[in-house]
Amino acid sequence: MAVIKCKPTSPGRRHVVKVVNTDLHKGKPFAGLLAKKTKSGGRNNTGRITVRHVGGGHKQHYRIVDFKRNKDGIPAKVERLEYDPNRTAHIALVLYADGERRYILAAKGMKAGDPIQSGLDAEIKTGNARPLRNIPVGSVVHAVEMKPGKGAQIARSAGAYVQVVARDGAYATLRLRSGEMRKVPVDCRATFGEVGNAEHMLRQLGKAGAKRWRGVRPTVRGVAMNPVDHPHGGGEGRTSGGRHPVSPWGVPTKGYKTRSNKRTDKYIVRRRNK
């Protein structure tokens, strides 16, 4: 993995910082694990914008990634690592002994030819998956389920990981990167190690167009809008907005707590660090 700062041969190249991984597959992805991906432009079925700053971008296929890791007892081998445009992490194409291929998240240090396995008897080794009840306390894991059999939801992005800090009865306690301590059922699965491509955070796109290639549209400041569009809009000349910062719908944006899910409050042992 190399971090390359581009020479300023043009204004668009001046600030570009690339992260280059020579171990990634240079050919096409495995066709049997691709799905069609239709762009919405941030609109719902009525045609109204429900997600701002979304639209355009290069056409992409979705890679079907195995987040459940439920193929127990069958050894597999990593065939190759691939780039995935749909996520910050890289993915690994694995070939099982019975001939099936699946994509999984590429863990830190994973390379082509590595053996992996999932199940109760899987070795304690990066890339192997086990239920939390069979993972030693203190282990660093990623791709953690929140409900048994649902598929991984926690620690899936580049460089992410959580630590198993305790196990009591039907629940294991995890320490998340944010500092939050959360309980998860011990029958949920997790994968040993960290997610790879941690250098992703060092990347700099360098120009607005690179964001547009990724389907991200510009963000307009509220004070630059009209009063009909935003609470900060309007006024003669430049203004400060005239009030504490709020969203277009009037919700305070600076540190205001918006979490309201009492059903799952009991699973949070400690809120995240501020």
UniProtKB/Swiss-Prot annotation:
Keyword vocabulary terms for this entry: Ribonucleoprotein, Ribosomal protein, RNA-binding, rRNA-binding
SMART domains: Ribosomal_L2, Ribosomal_L2_C
An individual GO BP term: cytoplasmic translation
Molecular function via GO: rRNA binding; structural constituent of ribosome; transferase activity
Region (Disordered): 223-274
Gene Ontology, cellular component aspect: large ribosomal subunit
InterPro entries named in the record: NA-bd_OB-fold, Rib_uL2_dom2, Ribosomal_uL2, Ribosomal_uL2_bac/org-type, Ribosomal_uL2_C, Ribosomal_uL2_CS, Ribosomal_uL2_dom3, Ribosomal_uL2_RNA-bd_dom
Subunit description: Part of the 50S ribosomal subunit. Forms a bridge to the 30S subunit in the 70S ribosome.
Function text: One of the primary rRNA binding proteins. Required for association of the 30S and 50S subunits to form the 70S ribosome, for tRNA binding and peptide bond formation. It has been suggested to have peptidyltransferase activity; this is somewhat controversial. Makes several contacts with the 16S rRNA in the 70S ribosome.
Family of the protein in this entry: Belongs to the universal ribosomal protein uL2 family.
Protein name: Large ribosomal subunit protein uL2
Originating species: Shewanella frigidimarina (strain NCIMB 400)
